[in-house]
Amino acid sequence: MADAAMSGEEKEEDGGKRTTAATPAETLGFYEPSDGSRVETKKRSLSDLSLLRFISAELTRGYFLENNEAKYKERREKVYTCLRIPRELEKLMVFGFFLCLDAFLYVFTLLPLRVLLALIRFLTLPCCGLSDGRVLQPAQVCDVLKGVILVICYFIMHYVDYSMMYHLIRGQSVIKLYIIYNMLEVADRLFSSFGQDILDALYWTATEPKERKRAHLGVIPHFFMAVLYVILHAILILVQATTLNVAFNSHNKSLLTIMMSNNFVEIKGSVFKKFEKNNLFQMSNSDIKERFTNYVLLLIVCLRNMEQFSWNPDHLWVLFPDVCMVIASEIAVDVVKHAFITKFNDITADVYSEYRASLAFELVSSRQKNACTDYSDSVSRRMGFIPLPLAVLLIRVVTSSVKVQGILAYSCVVLFYFGLITLKVLNSIVLLGKSCQYIKDANMEEKLFQPPTCQPGKTPKKAQNKSKPNQGHPPDETANTSVTSQPTKAASTAQLLVESNSDKLLTTPDAEEKDISGDNSELKQKQADKDLLDIDRFTICGNRID
């Protein structure tokens, strides 16, 4: 029995050894291997760390992009957005350029005719009498003031010696001229921001109702301030044009290169800042104004250079490469700047269509029968483009560069004037057609017939607090008159601060306004008013002049 038990134990030990030996092959190493297998595995791992095997692993290593599909789709959309930015931006720039051109041509074409009609009305007043108790309509008073300012500033500009200014600037060093040009750009923006306020103050002071108690300096002081502003701004632009002319005529073109490199510094100052849609709209309007002003400066430089070379057409081809280089650098800087701003702030390229629709809405609204402000003043407030100083300078340069002698020359001047009128009319018609198309594409037709939110003699915040009992009504139901309807006499005797409907389109959607109620609607309205201050460059309101 003992032998049998011993033999059973030996069998069990043999079986255990057999199972233990077979376990590593069957269980793939779930049990601890023996010492021999450890040594063999270590030798195999050391042999796996060879350089060739590492290179082979790097060359054959795979990965699966579909595991992070959402991230890669987002990156692809950003690339597509950057590719769409140049096209959408240039559409906005072209539309804005023709808006500025329309306001600029108005000074040369329709403004003299409107002043002439106002003078005819004034001279025929004893025969016709006063139909509505006024000598001139408010719009006619503003036109006469613009015409008088234009004529006075033109004659004062004759005392500015362009040749002396050119040689004075040419004698300076390159670095000093670069600093001067940068200072002139900053001063131009400051003048533009304050100049329209001076002109608006003059227009309202001259047309304010007589029965109201006047708390201002009077028309004459405001008029002299406006003349002084236009003169200083015109001289500032003349110095800019002279500096650019010196850069064009320099032998090594180093100054022109430095001035163009200044545009690329603008990328550094704006790309890495946080931008909202409203801030980007403000910057886009500033870029439109800057590009149009640069084109007029280039025109002035070409006129002065062609006069110095006795209008030799061969010299025009000498200037052509430099002009193209300046324009190309300006376009490249704008494209790169807007592309990276939209990329870093997650703004789609469709936002430029909204900007274009907003400008179109302002254009169509300002063409209404009873608009709150003149169209050229609306462009000035929106883009910071004031055409009067630039028009004074261009007239001064053209009259000094082109000599008109003889009947044939005067006939050419008359034909040229009629050509400008034709261009102005065609440009206005095309702009109105395009604007209506943009408004239709943006589904904004019904907003053209909504009245502006106005309160006489109140700021927007005070007017909002006064209208708190009517918060239960939707915004669309508070409308009781049309934009094209005739205003009442009581409303015409007060200064109305008008909130632009196009600004509201970029801040508060209609669907959200109809759903919210009570305190939420008040909070939304306050937020919209805060955003409007960011959208408009100088003021969110147009003063109604009646």
Curated annotation (Swiss-Prot):
Where found in the cell? Cytoplasm, Cytoskeleton, Microtubule organizing center, Centrosome; Cytoplasm, Cytoskeleton, Cilium basal body; Membrane
Q: How does it sit in the membrane?
A: Multi-pass membrane protein
Which residue spans traverse the membrane? 92-112, 149-169, 219-239, 316-336, 384-404, 413-433
Q: What is its main location?
A: cytoplasm
Instruction: Note the Pfam families from the entry.
Output: DUF747 (PF05346)
List keywords of the entry alphabetically. Cell projection, Chondrogenesis, Cilium, Cilium biogenesis/degradation, Cytoplasm, Cytoskeleton, Developmental protein, Differentiation, Membrane, Osteogenesis, Transmembrane, Transmembrane helix
One GO CC term on file: ciliary basal body
> According to the UniProt entry, which residue ranges have a biased composition of type Basic and acidic residues?
514-529
InterPro entries (alphabetical): Tatp1 (IPR008010)
A Gene Ontology annotation in the biological process aspect, one of them, is: cell projection organization
Family note: Belongs to the TAPT1 family.
Q: What is this protein's function? A: Plays a role in primary cilia formation. Involved in cartilage and bone development. May play a role in the differentiation of cranial neural crest cells. May act as a downstream effector of hoxc8 during development.
Per its record, how is this protein called by name? Answer: Transmembrane anterior posterior transformation protein 1 homolog
Source species: Xenopus laevis (African clawed frog)
Query: By which gene is this protein encoded?
Result: tapt1
